[in-house]
Design a protein with these regions (language model features):
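Loop/turn-to-beta-strand initiation segments
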Residues: 1-6, 65, 114-117
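Conserved catalytic network of the ASCE P-loop NTPase/AAA+ motor domain
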Residues: 1-2, 61, 108-113, 127
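A short beta-strand-to-loop transition that corresponds to the Sensor-1 phosphate-sensing loop
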Residues: 7-11, 70-73, 120-123, 139
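Short secondary-structure boundary/capping segments
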Residues: 17-24, 83, 134, 180-182
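Conserved two-lobed SF2 helicase motor
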Residues: 110-125, 137
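Interdomain hinge/linker at the junction between the two RecA-like core domains of SF2 helicases
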Residues: 7-61
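Signature of the SF2 helicase/ATPase Hel1-core->accessory helical subdomain module
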Residues: 2-20, 131-161
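C-terminal helicase lobe and adjacent C-terminal extensions/tails of nucleic-acid helicase motors
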Residues: 54-63, 69, 74, 78-81, ...
Length: 332
């Protein structure tokens, strides 16, 4: 027997999924009284509609401090070049170690009340404890917008913080998950004055589940359990018959079209020593080097490799050997 506890600021209503795919699972909603939720509202969401990156950069520069979150690394790099004044950048083009250093600098600047602007992709929306007076979030899924809002007036130091949702001319693959979430959120921004309300969040996730019903059914654990006869006569699942290999093959958290490369940071003694250890053939440092690595698409990898700036020294782990390709502000 086991129990699972789901916690989120943007909690979906899983009852429809459980009832359909896991009908024998017992579940309870731990929070049913929402009357006091209003006391936790520390920011207000405003829809700016369609605008330009130049306008966003200009508006952010007028704020006490600001975080701008966009959907793609390409857009973040373009926006960062437009921002004036003291600015910082965060994206997956930077190694985890590099991002951690920047986050620590930003945190200190914010605590000292300094006027700064941070441009980031969605990675700042989870597990990053920063507190901004103002947040600008490019139109995305409602869950992403609300997570970005969690970085606004986080500690309640101001009477109210502001989250500005903006749209720009950007094309997404038709039928993609992001395109679907954006279209759903557009309608909710028009319909609801308060997009943090329970009804708004529920309608958003209901729409997401309805859109993805066939895909959920195709990839559900229940389907594989039925196919593999995982249940005994009492209807209990045997752990020895669970098709773990099938689950693993279906689950892809990181795209298979990417490859991780190590960035040898000459300014980081620990990183440099790990790289030297790897060059000497000691593969035990592979895990430690993950914090000094960046994942890139195969076409980018092939381009860098053809230029002779990636070497694996016979280890199968590629290292960027030309540091001019890695920017101290924006990464690779």
């Amino acid at each position: 027997n086991s129990e699972a506890l789901f916690l989120s600021a943007t909690m979906p209503d899983y009852s429809k999924l459980f009832d359909k795919f896991l009908p024998d699972v017992n579940y309870n909603k731990l929070v049913t009284d929402r009357t006091n939720f209003k006391y936790f509202k520390k920011c207000e969401y405003k829809d700016m509609g369609k605008t330009s990156l130049e306008t966003i950069a200009e508006n952010a520069s007028r704020c006490k401090n600001a975080l701008i979150v966009v959907n793609t690394k390409k857009t973040s790099a373009e926006l960062y070049s437009l921002v004036q004044g003291e600015k910082y950048y965060l994206s997956a083009n930077m190694t985890p170690a590099h991002r951690s250093r920047v986050i620590e600098v930003v945190r200190n600047k914010l605590e000292n009340g300094e006027h700064i602007t941070v441009v980031s992709t969605s990675l700042v929306e989870a597990g990053v404890d920063l507190d901004f007076n103002t947040v600008f979030r490019q139109l995305s899924g409602l869950d992403s917008i609300l997570q970005a809002g969690g970085r606004c007036n986080r500690e309640g130091k101001d009477d109210k913080g502001y989250v500005y949702v903006f749209d720009i001319d950007e094309t997404y693959r038709k039928g993609s998950d992001l395109a679907m979430r954006i279209n759903k959120t557009k309608g909710l921004l028009e319909k609801y004055q308060d997009i943090t309300s329970y009804d708004c969040i529920k309608e958003y996730y209901d729409g997401i589940f309805d859109f993805n019903q066939s895909r959920i059914a195709e990839n559900s654990i229940a389907k594989y359990n039925e196919q593999s006869n995982s249940f005994d006569r009492q209807g209990l699942m045997s752990p020895y018959s669970i098709p773990f290999r099938s689950y693993a093959m279906q689950f892809e958290y990181i795209s298979a079209d990417t490859i991780s490369i190590v960035i040898d940071d000459p300014n980081d003694q620990t990183c440099h020593e790990l790289v030297e250890t790897l060059r000497n053939g000691d593969m035990s440092v592979r895990r430690a080097l993950q914090k000094y690595s960046v994942s890139i698409y195969m076409n980018v990898f092939k381009d860098l490799y053809s230029q002779g700036v990636l070497k694996d020294h016979g280890t199968g782990i590629f290292i960027l050997v030309n540091q001019s390709y890695y920017n101290n502000e924006t990464g690779l």
